[in-house]
Amino acid sequence: MSAALRFDNIGKVFPGVRALDGISFDVHAGEVHGLMGENGAGKSTLLKILGGEYQPDAGSVLVDGQPVQFASAAASIAAGIAVIHQELQYVPDLTVAENLLLGRLPNAFGWVRKREAKRYVRERLAAMGVDLDPDAKLGRLSIAQRQMVEICKALMRNARVIALDEPTSSLSHRETEVLFKLVDDLRAQGRALIYISHRMDEIYRLCNACTIFRDGRKIASHESLADVPRERLVAEMVGREISDIYHYAPRALGDVRFAAEGIDGPALREPASFSVRAGEIVGFFGLVGAGRSELMRLVYGADHRRAGVLTLDGARIDVKRTGDAIRHGIVLCPEDRKEEGIIAIASVAENINISCRRHSLRAGLFINRKAESETADRFIQRLKIKTPNRRQKIRFLSGGNQQKAILSRWLAEPDLKVVILDEPTRGIDVGAKHEIYDVIYRLAERGCAIVMVSSELPEVLGVSDRIVVMREGRIAGELPREQANEHAVLSLALPQTSAVEAA
């Protein structure tokens, strides 16, 4: 039986980088084929070829045994291919219904039949078990909700071949379970699926087969994962053994470096207070909508704070906007790195140096390009940022390498005191996570107070000295590392009725 989808010796070269080199594997109807590899291994590039965004420089793609070459995304869609990229593609000023039906809204004599469109969307969303308001504007939804819209858009096209790139990176547990059911249903219907994820649990839960990429090459293909240990997949991905991804080691902690008292804002149900000692890593955990990111934005001055007092090294500080926070040595690495973290049109060097340009000025007027280049090269080497050179536009880097560049930006700051990391390893492979944890530990050893917001409970348990748990817009409790385990943390994070049931 011929494969529903075949990649035959695919090659793709960008200036200075061989992104794909001789990639070949099959995906069969009724199969979920996992695709794993470090950031920059070529997984997303392959999906962009499948989706018509890139053209291969070598090899061919076959659908149902027939060679195809998609000159555009529209051609790929017309051939029954649906690709859900990690970078969300939506129109923020349009509604959920309008985004889902973009380009195919029902009309009569040039007029869009909005009532019919909304009814159709509502029925399809209900059938998929997705709770979204068809009238809501996309730009006002959370990242998780926008991601569900993107997934639903692809599924509503009834594609024969569906590729999903890190689809659960922003989803809650409930939304993830909805997605898993959709994937299982699509497999039962005979669709062919490619599933990219760095989360081992998802790969073993969903995938019949799995292919591993490293540095643009296929390292291995497994027709079944039943007898393949996780350690083997990790070693194939990164080319080395990683026995303990978190490699936590206790540190000597100093006095309270940063404290927030009575912080209040629209997203919080009651005022919140917390503190962090010098050299301490405090993990913030909670379900989607718990208010963790919103609290951090209030502390950082990104959103208006109705009340609250901030102290740094025992002295009260006034933070009304982000510039105030940065002047006091407080920085935030945001949850949505593409929208708020990077300057996509700028180079890697410019993104690394943007926060410390005041230290790179010559005569107070001109940027010292030599110092800027030396700083960028130092951190590219130190953090193993995969880029052809420092002049490469950062938008062409993988998510993990973009995140390393953002972290480099703050490592270059000489007066850093407080670092707030919001989902620092979202969508990042196991090898890059290992390196980012090294950066976090390095910052803590410098005496920085670290706040790490994460939706990955194993990460919070593995990295943190202390864990603060939020639930429904308030701080539900905190646990020292010695008392923290999955049951204790989830008992605080879940709504009280669910917590009783879970126990």
UniProtKB/Swiss-Prot annotation:
Membrane topology annotation: Peripheral membrane protein
Disulfide bonds: none
Domain of life: Bacteria
Domain ABC transporter: 5-240, 251-497
Reaction(s) this enzyme catalyzes, per UniProt: L-arabinose(out) + ATP + H2O = L-arabinose(in) + ADP + phosphate + H(+)
Chief location bin: membrane
Pfam families hit by this protein: ABC_tran
Name of the protein in its database record: Arabinose import ATP-binding protein AraG 1
Protein source organism: Burkholderia lata (strain ATCC 17760 / DSM 23089 / LMG 22485 / NCIMB 9086 / R18194 / 383)
